[in-house]
Amino acid sequence: MSRHALVTYFYQSAFTVSLKKTLIVFSYRQTGLSQLAPEQQLSEKDFQGFNNILVFVPNNSLTHHDRKAIYSWKPSFPITYILSEDAMKDTPDLPHIRVCREGDSFSVAQAKVSVFGSTDTGVSYLVEAEDVCVFHAGDLNLWHWREENTLREITRAEESFYDKVAAIPKDKVDICFFPLDPNQGGLYDAGANHIIMAIRP
């Protein structure tokens, strides 16, 4: 089978993956985006032509859950929202919302979704659609600050992160979205380097 995916980056952890019949939206954030001109933001014209639109919210933080934007899209579009449990607060009553937690696995809108853990709040997602496998880490990362943390704190952070990553299938992921935060200081990319070697996207 021929595989094709178009990846669009918006801001912070916000990405879309456009397949032939499926649009996958991760952590879309629009509120307060001075970096993007209005014509660069995701709009309903971008939804046209897709049979299924999957909108993933990995946690309830403002970085990942822009309620004003994502729930304003017309209900006539074939949109399914997949939310972590903590993101359900103040969510409008819409017909196509799926709430999930770590360890869940289910099929929705002709896609298979596996839900993995996080080392912060919420979850991470593995999505398989149209023979393409995409992983979005949410806030899963090796959260350590080498200049500030004690050795014990760093060790605990490493153990927690390695444990979460070990659950993700190897040699299966085609596209991996993972956070990088230079505010962590030295070795801020340690988590990204590890997940690349571990799951080999």
Enumerate the language-model features and the residues they cover.
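N-terminal pre-catalytic "stem/leader" segment of glycosyltransferase-like enzymes
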Residues: 1-20
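Active-site-proximal beta-strand elements of phosphoester/diester hydrolases
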Residues: 6-9, 24-27, 112-118, 133-139, ...
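Pre-active-site segment of Zn-dependent metallo-hydrolases
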Residues: 16-73, 140-170
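A short helix->loop->beta-strand "cap" motif at the edges of active sites that frequently abuts
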Residues: 22, 75-80, 197-201
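Active-site environment of divalent metal-dependent phosphoester hydrolases
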Residues: 32-33, 60-68, 86-91, 104-106, ...
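A short acidic, amphipathic alpha-helical/loop segment
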Residues: 67-73, 93, 190-195
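Metallo-beta-lactamase
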Residues: 77-132
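Cap/insert and terminal regions of metallo-dependent hydrolase folds
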Residues: 145-201
